[in-house]
Amino acid sequence: MARIRVTEYLDLELDDERWRCRVCDHDLGSARENYKHACQINQRDPREIHQPLIEAEYTFAPDPDWVRIVEFHCPGCFTQIETEYLPPGHPVTHDIEIDLDRLRERLDAGELEIRDERLGSTR
């Protein structure tokens, strides 16, 4: 199986075009779709992470009316795969979109190769 490490905790299984958790190998959906939709999603009040630094009207802590910390966890092992700071109600972002067809073409043509689960140039 051809596997590519995309992020610290996210792999691309190229043969079956699936996202996989790097820790527990949980299937996170089609690599042609947003892996985040298969994740456990938790929204946190930013004040839980960024404690107010001073007792005043402006505390240097993010305002929860303006921002939420959105965490994406693997549903298999609960490893945190991604974190985003988004306005409340903002849709889930689609931050990784790989052109799988072009990637396969370049691998087949020998322009790229997979070494130790990393994508590398042959030139």
Question: Where are these predicted regions, by residue range?
Answer:
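Short recognition patches in nucleic-acid-associated and regulatory proteins
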Residues: 1-8, 22, 26-63, 86-88
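Short, intrinsically disordered terminal segments enriched in charged and Pro/Gly residues
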Residues: 1-12, 88-123
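Short, well-ordered loop/turn elements at secondary-structure boundaries
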Residues: 14-15, 23
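Flanking scaffold residues of small Cys/His-coordinated metal-binding clusters
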Residues: 15-16, 66-69
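Short cysteine-rich clusters marking metal-coordination/redox-active sites
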Residues: 21-25, 74-77
